[in-house]
Amino acid sequence: ADDLGWADLSCYGNDLHQTPNLDRLAKQGVRFTDAYSASPVCTPTRAAILTGLHPARLHMTTWRESALNRGNRKLLQPVCLDYLPLKHATLAELLKQAGYFNAHIGKWHLGRAESYPHAHGFHVNIGGTLWGAPQTFWYPYNGDGYFRDWRYVPDLEPGSEDDYLTDRLTDKALATMEEQAKVSRPFYLNL
């Protein structure tokens, strides 16, 4: 989950949020009690997970494009890219070389079109764009058209008025896993 803290889960004592499925996984599997997140925000952390590099090495230390290198600031900012550089190998690229089918479904927020998931080793990209969120999570996901196309959800076929984006993306993820299981091909799902 994006920006999920360890204390947000009921298996760690949180009474506010009920997380039965995650609790079951924690009980039956492994708990990461000493894990380290590369950044407190989404974009740098996602880039670090995909490349294995610290956000500072990638020059990706923020998630807000509007916070990048604006000339009227009194403090000098470090160079900060608004895209995941193609020169860095990603987990998906390495898995692709090993014969995996790679699907990215959901939030990307790692740069413009030339740096979308297909450019980083993913066979499928559903929803991954420059923007961190669609204008709305209710179908048709693009609201009133106020924002540019990159704020929409690409490669997701039309749905119905009652469709909620999280449910649609979950359905696509499940369908992708079922398809890959039928062909007995190893796969990596980045959701």
What are these regions (language model features)?
Residues 19-20, 49, 98, 107, ...:
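Polar, surface-exposed loop/tail segments
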Residues 22, 45, 91-92:
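Short, hydrophobic alpha-helical packing/hinge segments within bilobed ligand-binding/sensory domains
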Residues 60-100, 110-191:
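Formylglycine-dependent
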Residues 8, 26-29, 34, 39, ...:
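Sec/Tat-exported extracytoplasmic proteins
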Residues 1-5, 24-25, 34, 49-51, ...:
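Beta-strand elements within well-structured catalytic alpha/beta cores of enzymes
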Residues 11-15, 31-53, 61-67, 104-115, ...:
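Short, solvent-exposed turn/loop segments enriched in Gly/Ser/Thr/Pro and often Arg
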Residues 1-30, 97:
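Active-site-proximal N-terminal segment of extracellular/periplasmic enzymes that hydrolyze or transfer
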